Amino acid sequence: MNTSRWLLMLTLAVVLALGLAACGGDQATQAPATQAPAATEAPAATQPPAQASSPDAQAAREKGLTFLADAYDGKYKGTVVTMTGPFTDEDAVKFNNSVKEFEEKTGIDIQYEGSKQFEASISVRVDAGDAPDIVDFPQPGLLGNFVKAGKVVDLNTFMSEDWLKQNYKQSWLDMATMEGPDGPMMAGVWQRFNGKSLVWYPKAKFEEAGYEIPQTWDELMALTQQIADDGDTAWCIGIESGAATGWPATDWIEDIMLRTTSLENYDKWTRGELKFESPEVKNAAELMAQIWFNDDYVYGGRASIVSTFFGDAPTPMFEDPPKCWLHRQGNFITSFFPEGVEAGKDYDFFYFPPIDAEYGKPFLVAGDIMAMFNDRPEVRAVMEFFSTGESVKAWLAAGGALSPHNDASLDWYGDDVERGIAELVQQADAVRFDGSDLMPGAVGAGSFWKGMTDWIAGAIDLDTALKEIDAAWPQE
């Protein structure tokens, strides 16, 4: 092969090799381009980001209230939660106003049906398998019957225990814990309450007379005697209430029981495990009688107590000069005060004082516990909402309710009186529900009322009254 041909062939080989290399280079640089959509997932990257949780949802999630958080994020928008309870008229309006903002933020429609025959109607509905999603019980004893029958959802199955302990005094949780078919369970959450351990007095006249607020039972008795020595009767008392005559007397017994025996004994008493004939209950009645049965201490004397309508009992306190100076009753009684009297000027209140220092400063209450009968996510969300002070905030501003929630600010109250009562309850060593409302109806709304009325009227002695009350307790 001559040199020229060899050079030509070599040149062609080099050119061909370079051409192949160039083709290979094109493939190498194109490969990432053909894989780019998969490697960078461009379509996903260009999608709009998920909507951020609202501040309300974030706050709920931080508290462990996951269903409430989801509700604020709109997850249950368009759903309906049915409720029933005793709220009618003005109370129904206040309740609906208190949940209105929640409904607007979540899109959940809370349909509340109030009934003046609530106790009878709810039993019919539950027995017929037509229970609403949530029921508002003013009487925990009635709720306890449904819990025992296995009709109520245990809130411990979904609600944060840490949150409940953070937002309620232990006493509220104790009162919401009831015996179910499989043992103790969290039967509901407390949403609002009324305070009972209160003594009302005509503030301006009281101060003008030089009287001082008693801090103990002994000081209360000394004040009572001081007023008697001044020629007046200290106490305004009346227990007439139609078919319910006698109930104000049961409140006195309950308040004194809380101050003279243990919470365990009080709870046993409400369950029928501590008899009315026991020394503990008899002692409470005898302490009450020190005031009630002394004609120098009670306006109109003992004989007037049974015939005086409970709502009229405090009226003489506002005469000039007052015909009586002290009236023990719950915060609802202000609605019976004469028109035009001014809180903080014409009247005020003080805490019904402790008796035995061993039992501290307990507080007697009545109120509403919300229980869940149907288990769906949106119902769980509403129940978690009821465990927050926000659920009753609008009601506090409007007046007529107190909040059991630790996260409810005292600044939310539109009434100085109710704010002061709420503060007392926050400071209380323990809280217990009205005992007669925890007892079976035959006792709490029957023999207890009648026994106290007959004893106060002088128709029977104390031992007979206590024995007759015990005899009415249902035998299982």
Predicted features by range, described:
Residues 70-75, 156-171, 239, 258-283, ...:
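Short, solvent-exposed loop/beta-turn-alpha elements that line the ligand-binding surface or hinge
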Residues 77-88, 108-113, 134, 187, ...:
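Short, well-ordered beta-strand elements
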Residues 100, 104-105, 128, 184, ...:
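Extracytoplasmic/periplasmic substrate-recognition and gating elements
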Residues 140-151, 156, 171-218, 239-269, ...:
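Periplasmic solute-binding protein
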Residues 224-226, 270-306:
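Glycine-centered hinge/linker elements that transmit conformational signals in sensory
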Residues 269-270, 364, 396-408, 419-476:
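C-terminal capping/gating helix-and-loop segments adjacent to ligand/active sites or protein-protein/ligand interfaces
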